[in-house]
Amino acid sequence: MKNRFLVLGLVAVVLVFVIIGLCIWLPYTSGKPDHVYSRAAVATDAKRCSEIGRDILQEGGSVVDAAIASLLCMGLMNAHSMGIGGGLFFTIYNSTTGKVEVINAREVAPRLANTTMFNNSKDSEEGGLSVAVPGEIRGYELAHQRHGRLPWARLFQPSIQLARHGFPVGKGLAIALDKKRDVIEKTPALCEVFCRQGKVLQEGETVTMPKLADTLQILAQEGAKAFYNGSLTAQIVKDIQEAGGIMTVEDLNNYRAELIEHPMSIGLGDATLYVPSAPLSGPVLILILNILKGYNFSPKSVATPEQKALTYHRIVEAFRFAYAKRTMLGDPKFVDVSQVIRNMSSEFYATQLRARITDETTHPAAYYEPEFYLQDDGGTAHLSAVSEDGSAVAATSTINLYFGSKVLSRVSGILFNDEMDDFSSPNFINQFRVAPSPANFIKPGKQPLSSMCPSIILDKDGQVRMVVGASGGTQITTSVALAIINSLWFGYDVKRAVEEPRLHNQLLPNTTTVEKDIDQVVTAGLKIRHHHTEVTPTFIAVVQAVVRASGGWAAASDSRKGGEPAGY
């Protein structure tokens, strides 16, 4: 009996020590936010690429240096989404000057392109005719000329090594390979890179890109001119023309990235959002937020089931009004969209639209007055980064649909975009019986409309508060809006702001798409208000964000694509 009491006594003592230990230890573990860095942070959609950016910053590189090095890596590890055969937009905050600027390096239509070249065919989605003039490398060049600190060639070295020696297929690339399995296995040039024994690679298997490594080495040594007016130019044109394209040497010679010194901006309480204007979707994002800020959202807006259901109904209605107006946007160098953009950025206009939102019900598509129809655009990749000096970059890059044009050069290893598919065509018959948008028709040298919106938010003192953007085609703009709403208005930490289940509505089709883990209170509330909802079998977009936190910079790379941030 005594032995039994002795054992029980010892167990009790051990339990006391365990409980005391947990009380001391838990506050320092479970209470500590994930991925908070005291000095600098880089959030990409691939862990290794975030680490490359961090390493560049620790070497003394600028935030633009880090972004370029990370983007080159992302073009390998998520080659289905972006790469040097595509184009991008940078939004850059320079803490020394206190100014935000945008660099436009989006692809343009070749000079032999014309409005009716596709005639409702699939040629805009794959093959040489779908390839627009790439802008990626010219974009890197201009950004580096303005803000670079380390030598240009240094930024290429990590990706040259990765391409030459190989890297494991990550979650995002594995999903894309599985989705496009048939076309990849039937396309020899693609299968040489992305297959093993004739079957697409699986997650964790090693992929090498030796030809692309050689091309990156040439670009590192010779600069951007090698691509546009140098040793790589003739082969690029040959590859595209042999695949049925119309690109010429002159198209590459004449391509220039554009500096925009006064991007769009909007006041959000004591903060200011900066974002690119058309042909990107900054005006759409601004209209969504302008409509919604009149509701004075706060943590209370999602505190009860009733409030949460109403709040999400209002959000979806704002999406629908904004996407109706998106159909009138196009490249401002070719079409006069100044009045449309003025309206979309006007608080008075947003107030008028907000007054048309009824809290009891949604409405048929015609209620929101869509002028035209715009087809979906494709996937992308996004990076958000902040450096020690408080400078920041939001960069969104794309080759459009998964694996772009499916034209991969067996000489240079470059995978080319299918950005021509982002234009509208007068001969395209859509299922909604809404006319295609003339503002987005093809013209030589024109840029197609895009959903991308790399965003930087500054506080009232001009310091970075949030850097955010997304990939995921037409769902990009709504997902960036939700991340901003979650962070600024609902008070979520950055991880929750990014990971919170999302929903999307672009008016046409007249369906609200929701992720499977979304709160049932939200879907029930939408149903009561006559929304048609569908659960997506996959996910809605992929967001990367960095937010100022008490301990420094809190960073989040969306788990939907398997990314992870890095910093120090």
UniProtKB/Swiss-Prot annotation:
It is found in: Cell membrane. The chain crosses the membrane at residues 5-26. Residues 27-568 are extracellular. L-glutamate binds at residues 106, 398-400, 419, 422, 450-451, 473. Its main location: membrane. It catalyses: an N-terminal (5-L-glutamyl)-[peptide] + an alpha-amino acid = 5-L-glutamyl amino acid + an N-terminal L-alpha-aminoacyl-[peptide]; glutathione + H2O = L-cysteinylglycine + L-glutamate; an S-substituted glutathione + H2O = an S-substituted L-cysteinylglycine + L-glutamate; leukotriene C4 + H2O = leukotriene D4 + L-glutamate. Residues 1-4 are cytoplasmic. It is a single-pass type II membrane protein. Disruption phenotype: Deficient mice have growth retardation, skeletal abnormalities. They are sexually immature, develop cataracts, and have coats with a gray cast. Most die between 10 and 18 weeks. They cannot break down GSH into its constituent amino acids as it passes through the proximal tubules of the kidney. They excrete large amounts of GSH in their urine, leading to a fatal cysteine deficiency. Heterodimer composed of the light and heavy chains. The active site is located in the light chain. This is Glutathione hydrolase 1 proenzyme. It comes from Mus musculus (Mouse). The gene is Ggt1.
